[in-house]
From Swiss-Prot:
Xref: PROSITE patterns: RIBOSOMAL_L36
UniProt record similarity statement: Belongs to the bacterial ribosomal protein bL36 family.
GO biological process terms on file: translation
Disulfide bonds: none
GO molecular function: structural constituent of ribosome
This protein's name: Large ribosomal subunit protein bL36
One Pfam family, short name: Ribosomal_L36
Length: 37
């Protein structure tokens, strides 16, 4: 899980979602998981 100021899709399978007011990227590739913080 990467925590960064700007989250971007790293591949075409990445999905940008909002959870509890946080922007997150979920992806089958665990390296692409990100959270805005």
């Amino acid at each position: 899980m990467k925590v960064r100021a700007s989250v971007k899709k790293m591949c075409e399978k990445c999905r940008v979602i909002r959870r509890h007011g946080r922007v997150m990227v979920i992806c089958p590739n665990p390296k692409h998981k990100q959270r805005q913080g």
